[in-house]
A protein has these predicted regions:
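N-terminal active-site wall of soluble small-molecule enzyme domains
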Residues: 1-42
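Conserved, mostly hydrophobic/aromatic
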Residues: 5, 37, 56, 71, ...
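Active-site-proximal loop/turn and secondary-structure-junction residues that shape catalytic pockets
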Residues: 7-8, 28-30, 49-51, 73-77, ...
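Structured alpha-helical segments in the cores of large, soluble enzyme domains
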Residues: 8, 12, 25, 74-75, ...
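Hydrophobic or amphipathic alpha-helical targeting/insertion segments
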Residues: 33, 38-47, 55-56, 64
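Active-site-proximal beta-alpha loop/turn segments in soluble metabolic enzymes
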Residues: 38, 76-95, 121-136, 162-179
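Conserved anion-binding
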Residues: 49-116
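C-terminal active-site-proximal or functional interface alpha/beta core segments in diverse enzymes
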Residues: 128-202
Length: 202
């Protein structure tokens, strides 16, 4: 379950959800947010900025913990949704750009702190209210390519790939939401094919 602040985290915990089942998101996490995530033992912290990597590394060393983290990657894809809720184009505030090399640099920085941070995998989110699979298909292919780059440069095969949510719902009567199982199967096939082509284990 995703939470995006210390407040949302507190609500989730109050509702009886175990910290290990939570992912801490947010592109502007405060020190309080990160400290709350560490204290709750959240399953994963999704990193969105270089400053956040440094902050979390400091807190992890101070507290003697080694949280599992994901790098949020901006993949530069067209999500075919309203521009206000598209989150994977280059000119936006979330994550590290694949095209500029920021994603690769973020991975290097986290791996340099591997005594404090456990890099578990990569995360992407291309937008909300998405009704066609093409954006997800491009995103899946690109992020699997980055997994292969990590293996080739660092000798590490990251175990987790999170392609995010954002599937459209019937918000107005004219909307025709996609079939979730069908879209999941399309993505599974793309990831499996890309992994096979690049020699990555699934």
């Amino acid at each position: 379950i995703d939470v995006c602040s210390a407040g949302e985290l507190a609500c989730a915990l109050r509702a009886g959800i175990c910290g290990a089942q939570l992912l801490m998101h947010g592109n502007n996490k405060s020190m309080d947010d990160l400290e709350a995530a560490l204290s709750a033992g959240v399953g994963y912290i999704v990193l969105d900025s270089f400053e956040e990597i440094a902050r979390l590394g400091f807190l992890a060393e101070r507290d003697g913990v080694r949280p599992r983290v994901l790098i949020r990657v901006t993949l530069g894809v067209e999500a075919h949704t309203h521009e206000f809720i598209a989150t994977a184009h280059e000119d936006q505030k979330f994550g590290f750009s694949l095209a500029t090399g920021d994603a690769a640099e973020a991975i290097r920085r986290v791996l340099a702190l591997q005594d404090r941070l456990e890099l578990a995998g990569l995360h992407s989110h291309i937008g909300s209210q998405i009704f066609v699979s093409s954006g997800f298909e491009v995103a899946a292919a690109r992020i699997v390519g980055l997994l292969a780059d990590v293996r080739d440069e660092h000798g590490v095969e990251l175990p987790l790939l999170n392609l995010g949510g954002g599937l459209g719902i019937k918000y107005v009567s004219a909307d025709e939401p996609p079939d979730v199982a069908q879209m999941a199967e399309v993505l599974r096939e793309i990831v499996a094919r890309q992994c096979a082509n690049l020699g990555l284990a699934i």
